[in-house]
Regions:
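Conserved N-terminal phosphate-binding loop of PLP-dependent enzymes in the Aspartate aminotransferase
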Residues: 1-167
Length: 167
């Protein structure tokens, strides 16, 4: 960084007191060695391809649940990202390139009901899935077994939300 900015975290600085900074591990030899090892493992792109494929399967499975249960939500995303969008009033996805509202940021960037979000998270937790907010990501470690487990947990969570009057 620039010297004038880095002075703020120096022990002796012109500002009179040291700015607290937790530091980073990027100069740590163990972290550097781990980073090199990971880069070698992902160099052929296979882990990323596997994560992306798992996410596509998960999005498809979750959307099938929503269609079958007639729930006005939609699941979309790119690569290994999964986004759940409650209160959706547009057409159902026809393929994995789908983005709600033709990617209209003003319609996509809205806050969802906090109580619904909490109930959704709790319903998934009760069914063995730890989901953060309205989105998730897959990794190369997610096999078809985990994807199927998650889709089944999502279906049970949707049923619970409906039974409790959230949807």
């Amino acid at each position: 960084g620039r010297a004038d900015l880095m002075q703020a975290i120096a022990f002796e600085n012109p500002f009179g007191q040291k700015m607290k900074h937790p530091g980073t591990y990027n100069a740590n030899p163990l972290s550097a060695a781990a980073g090199i090892a990971v880069l070698k493992q992902i160099a052929d792109g296979e882990p990323c391809r596997a994560a992306n494929e798992s996410a596509a399967k998960l999005r498809m499975g979750m959307n099938e649940v929503l269609t079958r249960k007639n729930v006005n939500w939609v699941v979309y995303g790119q690569f290994s990202i999964i986004k759940v969008f409650p209160g959706y009033d547009g057409p159902r996805p026809t393929d994995d390139s789908f983005v709600p509202y033709d990617n209209d940021f003003d319609r996509l960037d809205r806050k969802h009901d906090a109580q619904l979000g909490h109930a959704f998270r709790c319903a998934l937790l009760l069914n063995g899935v730890d989901w953060f907010g309205w989105g998730a990501m897959t990794t190369a470690a997610h096999s078809d077994a985990e994807i199927n487990f998650t889709v089944n947990a999502f279906e049970r969570a949707i049923d619970a939300l409906r039974n409790d009057g959230f949807i």
